[in-house]
Amino acid sequence: LRNALERSDRMLIRMGDPEVQALSAVAFTGTSVMDIDAAKVRGAGSNVHFDKVSVAYGAHVVLHPLSLDIAPGEILAMIGPSGSGKTTALRAVAGFVRPASGRIRIGATDVTDLPPYERGLGMVVQNYALFPHMRVEDNVAFGLRAQGADKGLVTERVKDALGTVGMSAYARRYPRELSGGQQQRVAIARALAVRPRVLLLDEPLSALDAQIRRNMVEEIARLHRSLPGLTILYVTHDQTEALTLADKIAIMRDGRVCSHGPTTELYRRPPNRFTAEFLGRANLLPVTIVEGVGLKGFATARHGDAMLAGAGRDEKAGAKSLLCIRPQHLSLTADSEHTNRIVGTLREVHWQGELTHLMLDVDGTPVRVSATRLPMALPEPGATVPLFFTPADTSLVPEDAGV
């Protein structure tokens, strides 16, 4: 019966269910068992290279020519709104989508024309794709058995993979006996058991509730620290997941990458308005440049009657720009570093546990303040409130760079 069920599983994969088919990248990785055994996960990650890769369905282009590199051992998060092309890009790497043009390389191998099971990948999808009639240990072993691995190697790999994700005690349970977070750990263990060159994570936490999702983000970060050579392409719409996990981020919009770079750099110095607003919350004050970047590394800009110092790109006097300030960098009290000052009218106050959010109007521009500490007596809505911030916590974004 078990053999018949496993043959049925293979048939489901061939029938093309996208989520079950995604498992084939895990189960039927093309790297032979002997090759995988020689290339331990630590230090064995491969780079991924997109060379002008585009995807179209008929006349509709869903991914415009994409050129991008993911370094070995790196976590790259692709984020963007629905329909931005991020999942299409991942599925092109997996081999589920055929590029209309361009090439994809994993390591030194051009995989553009290879089927999913010959690409040496691991993949975890949103709904986990665990086989309900198999115990945890058999789900994790599925890919290895499909490769023809001997029993001893399967036992060793399953034990190692379950230990890595903290699920050793659940080896004999069925998926229905596990929580959502535990099922996701099993799915990750199954992907790791085949020692993939690259791990693809497609919205892996979106089906979990908020608390479990936060815990799983920490688990994935811990996992990558324990396997520093593992290359990960992580697709998500959740900016917090991307900011927490990724070494680099590619922000997608309308089938194009509108920004790409180190996570901290994109957050602190967004190159365009869309990045500033999509990657966390941002206050964007319209300003006019008065003087370009000086010796201290800041430009001088005017917002209404306020003269402000801003970091970022050097622009000519008279240029229109946007001064980006994150809500947590605004303060209701000044200190020696808070040399920038603006004044707004308080509209609303929202308490959210450890944070209090103040909504203000500054010369017609909505401004949010997120604070952990506030004066004992908060001003009433309608009151005039001064706000202070440091030049180093700002970034000038060109007004015409909305992308």
Language-model segments: what does each one mean?
Residues 66-77, 131:
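Pre-Walker A (P-loop) beta-loop-beta motif of ABC nucleotide-binding domains
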Residues 1-8, 12-31, 35-37, 282, ...:
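Non-catalytic connector elements of ABC transporters
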Residues 79-81:
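The feature captures the beta-strand-to-loop junction immediately N-terminal to the Walker
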Residues 102-110:
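Conserved ABC transporter NBD signature motif
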Residues 75, 120-122, 126, 130-274:
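ABC ATPase nucleotide-binding domains
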